[in-house]
Amino acid sequence: FLLMAGICPAVLGFPDGTLGNDTLLHKDQDKGTQLDSLTLESINTDFAFSLYKMLALKNPDKNVVFSPLSISAALAIVSLGAKGNTLEEILEVLRFNLTESYETDIHQGFGHLLQRLSQPGDQVKIITGNALFIDKNLQVLAEFQEKTRALYQVEAFTASFQQPRVTEKLINDSVRNQTQGKIQELVSGLKERTSMVLVNILLFRGKWKVPFDPDYTFESEFYVDEKRSVKVSMMKIEELTTPYFRDEELSCSVLELKYTGNSSALFILPDKGRMQQVEASLQPETLKKWKDSLRPRKIDELYLPRLSISTDYSLEEVLPELGIRDVFSQQADLSRITGAKDLSVSQVVHKVVLDVNETGTEAAAATGANLVPRSGRPPMIVWFNRPFLIAVSHTHGQHILFMAKVINPVGA
């Protein structure tokens, strides 16, 4: 039998519409966990950067967009059904050590985090959801279903995998509804031997605390590399005071834009020709240095391209290089799912949609102050007209929800 994991996050930088009540949203059950939140944050950041480097290596000169937290959660759910070396490989790649943490604490920490992120009432909308589509002929252990439901709020559905097109439609319709139509299709060409599909969803809808004025947006050049440029819609904001840090050691500028509520986006702009140097330095300590060094700074003019990027990854080609191998092979031991060693993971599909545009707060809070020349200092201008990085974080624990490398703002 084969298990497929489908992961489909969407990050939307605009407030159009509201999120419906039919999403997989669950109230926070404030359970204590022995896994320290700072430890979980560092572990998740370490995994995020390791995965980023592998995706960037395998996709040179292409946009990279992914949700490390979404991928971690899907793998953690799979690990609930794993034993032996299969389990150890997954947890080690996620940066957990079973000699230092109890497995129960790991899952409680993850589940608690996902519930906290999904709490209603925040002005930033974050929806997390997990669904398991199980072939009607597959006998899944009650304990596995109970644990996935209790720890990760996984909703289980039965399907007929002998009719793959019907099952694909069932799964894709569910994904389309959960992502507010941003991801139209997650699975296609299901293999006949597939007997279970795990779907993980993370939907982020953020509104800028200080919005860009659409009247200022204009067509401009974005320099993909030294030889090629593309036309983009360049957003502009004037007289903005926002956290900023100039990292001379790594030759990059770091700027934070806040969303209303409890999230923010960190934009990292390497100097020309210094992207690889910045990428090589990505580790939890670097992120901590940047965040600790941010100070409010008056930006006279900020230029940021409007973004609409989608990516599609087959992570079964990437995760083995990070150390997760057994689960994709005949050696897979997922006997805590069915009670037998006859199940392996065939695919891990990760689809992401990243949209960022001008609109921000519900109040039309003004950005309308015009630039006034000052004597004594040159104007501070930050222009994102070449490749840059983005890390979207929730202020609860500063976990990276989404990470992106923007090579071409209008490309896939």
From Swiss-Prot:
Glycan attachment sites: 97, 177, 262
Entry's Gene Ontology molecular function annotations: serine-type endopeptidase inhibitor activity
Domain of life of the organism encoding this protein: Eukaryota
Region (RCL): 360-386
InterPro entries: Serpin_CS, Serpin_dom, Serpin_fam, Serpin_sf, Serpin_sf_1, Serpin_sf_2
Subcellular location(s) per record: Secreted
Secretion signal span: 1-20
GO cellular component: extracellular space
PROSITE patterns, sorted: SERPIN
Gene Ontology biological-process annotations: response to cytokine
Keywords, in A-Z order: Glycoprotein, Protease inhibitor, Secreted, Serine protease inhibitor, Signal
Site residues, Reactive bond: 374-375
CDD domains with a match to the protein in the record: serpinA3_A1AC (cd19551)
Family note: Belongs to the serpin family.
Domain comment as written in the entry: The reactive center loop (RCL) extends out from the body of the protein and directs binding to the target protease. The protease cleaves the serpin at the reactive site within the RCL, establishing a covalent linkage between the serpin reactive site and the protease. The resulting inactive serpin-protease complex is highly stable. Variability within the reactive center loop (RCL) sequences of Serpina3 paralogs may determine target protease specificity.
Note from the entry: The single human alpha1-antichymotrypsin gene (SERPINA3) is represented by a cluster of 6 individual rat paralogs.
Protein known as: Serine protease inhibitor A3M
Phylogenetic lineage: Eukaryota, Metazoa, Chordata, Craniata, Vertebrata
